[in-house]
Amino acid sequence: MKIAVLLSGGVDSSYSAYSLKEQGHELVGVYLKLHASEKKHDLYIKNAQKACEFLGIPLEVLDFQKDFKSTVYDEFISAYEEGQTPNPCTLCNPLMKFGLALDHALKLGCEKIATGHYARVKEIDKVSYIQEALDKTKDQSYFLYALEHEVIAKLVFPLGDLLKKDIKPLALNAMPFLGTLETYKESQEICFVEKSYIDTLKKHVEVEKEGVVKNLQGEIIGTHKGYMQYTIGKRKGFSIKGALEPHFVVGIDAKKNELIVGKKEDLATHSLKAKNKSLMKDFKSGEYFIKARYRSVPTKAFVSLKDEMIEVGFKESFYGVAKGQALVVYKDDILLGGGVIV
């Protein structure tokens, strides 16, 4: 089978290509230029070239920087301006990696596209679903919630049945040169964020604009440094007059540049809503597992789909719901779909 392999210049994607080559597939290596950091691209393209030379496969470099900026990067900035907490990876995957890059792969005559994601694909009743990775500590299925089933059918995740701790030894044994590759120390999972998301926002918008902090009764009780510097649940970085106990951000009013704070129990909710992006129209209401943040434990909840809104009800208190984050619905370890929390 002819497969396009997305190479990032790192160990995981290189080993993904190696394992597919060992299985006898015809491969085309593909590097995507997404964020606007040529210095990083130069280094990672060299790394990807080394992997391709070792495997004896061609490498294509696709420049999607303009598309990435308009559909992912600018949306990231806009969401923070609106007081939301966005997750750009959930946009990038369907639009860039498994959108534009998949389209290009199909034009090259490839049947499928592979990446180093920690996830799996499972076919149920002739429909392809994303399944959680074997290694639950590294599972990335959450970021893939917006993919259509027709797209999922064309995906290959060679690392899905492996444990992260085992991959580096396997990769170095198979491709010894990987141990000598230079990489950048990534500060977090967002590829275009150098130090912190605030530093990225500062390049485009005014983030250091002092405003007031109010309690749940609407009384002014302190000040903050600028609403974009805070996310739901944060308890530091703002001043409260005479505070004797911790206060947490429970709301953000972007238009007024105000924070609303309360006690930890004020972060609790028993329901939430999300604008549907990928749950199928015939979704049956019932008890499912949901995740409202990437690094959160799946929580059992009652989920229903009404028109374009996913409605979720919890038996017990659920904490730290932030507008703009992805709500993802699972049946056991099978991802059914999700939406954006409103």
Curated annotation (Swiss-Prot):
Catalysed reaction, written as an equation: S-sulfanyl-L-cysteinyl-[protein] + uridine(34) in tRNA + AH2 + ATP = 2-thiouridine(34) in tRNA + L-cysteinyl-[protein] + A + AMP + diphosphate + H(+)
Domain of life: Bacteria
Subcellular location: Cytoplasm
InterPro entries the record matches: MnmA-like (IPR004506), MnmA-like_C (IPR046885), MnmA-like_central (IPR046884), MnmA-like_central_sf (IPR023382), Rossmann-like_a/b/a_fold (IPR014729)
Cysteine pairs bridged by disulfides in the record: C92-C191
Enzyme class: transferase
Stretch list, region Interaction with tRNA: 138-140, 293-294
GO CC annotations on file: cytoplasm
Keywords annotated in UniProt: ATP-binding, Cytoplasm, Disulfide bond, Nucleotide-binding, RNA-binding, Transferase, tRNA processing, tRNA-binding
Main location, first listed in the record: cytoplasm
Residues at the active site: C92, C191
Binding site for ATP: L6, L7, S8, G9, G10, V11, D12, S13, L32, G116
GO biological process, one term: tRNA wobble position uridine thiolation
Record field: transmembrane: none
Any GO MF annotation of the entry: tRNA binding
EC number assigned by the record: 2.8.1.13
Keyword ATP-binding: yes
Site features described as Interaction with tRNA, chain residue numbers: H117, Q325
Family: Belongs to the MnmA/TRMU family.
Protein name, per record: tRNA-specific 2-thiouridylase MnmA
Gene encoding the protein: mnmA
